[in-house]
Amino acid sequence: MSVSGPLPRIPAEAGAALFTDARTAYSFADTPVDDATLTGIWELARWAPTAANTQPMRVLYVRTAEGKERLLPHLDEGNRPKSASAPVVAVLAVDHRFHEHLPHVLPVRPEMKEYFEGEPAQREAITSFNGPLQAGYFILAVRALGLAAGPMAGFDPAGIDKEFFADSDWHSILVVNIGHPAGPPAFDRMPRLAHEHALDWA
């Protein structure tokens, strides 16, 4: 596809699947999610923009009984049944050693690897902004592949990091339950702000 000139719009039904018709899932069917689909989520999400193409987000897929046993105690009590019912739980993290990949992902500026090595505050700034940005892309990629996402912030990051990432520089930022919904939403969709309350013009 050419990136010059007018770009095509996605069909209305695709926009609905990603945004207006999509709902957060709180319980899930037993239908498994295969490796190809989970890999496909990343294959979509990785193309969205990040600052200097740094791509600091990483994903841990938890789906075995053993993995769930390790994860659930670190979730807020009210969130545990949601993750227990999901066939897959994605722990989204940021890699504070993201700069080691810069010669590959930013070949026009390979020297930035050495710059970030000596600037831990700048690495923190990159991960704190771009990690959550990529998390948003990840949720949309889940929906694009016909699955429901249930993002949750109610967990103990330090506990998850100690349990799963003790030997790495990954640090958890979000937990996302993934699968097919077990049934209709438990409550009506909540309102969103109308443009009159959210937009300004200059």
From Swiss-Prot:
Obligatory cofactor(s): FMN
InterPro entries registered for this protein in UniProt: Nitroreductase, Nitroreductase-like, Nitroreductase_HadB/RutE, RutE-like
Keywords on record: Flavoprotein, FMN, NAD, NADP, Oxidoreductase
EC number: 1.-.-.-
GO MF term (any one): oxidoreductase activity
A Pfam family matched in the record: Nitroreductase
Gene3D superfamilies recorded: NADH Oxidase
Range of residues in the leader sequence: none
EC category: oxidoreductase
Family (UniProt): Belongs to the nitroreductase family. HadB/RutE subfamily.
NCBIfam families (alphabetical): PRK05365.1 (NF003768)
Name under which the protein is recorded: Putative NADH dehydrogenase/NAD(P)H nitroreductase SCO7141
Species of origin: Streptomyces coelicolor (strain ATCC BAA-471 / A3(2) / M145)
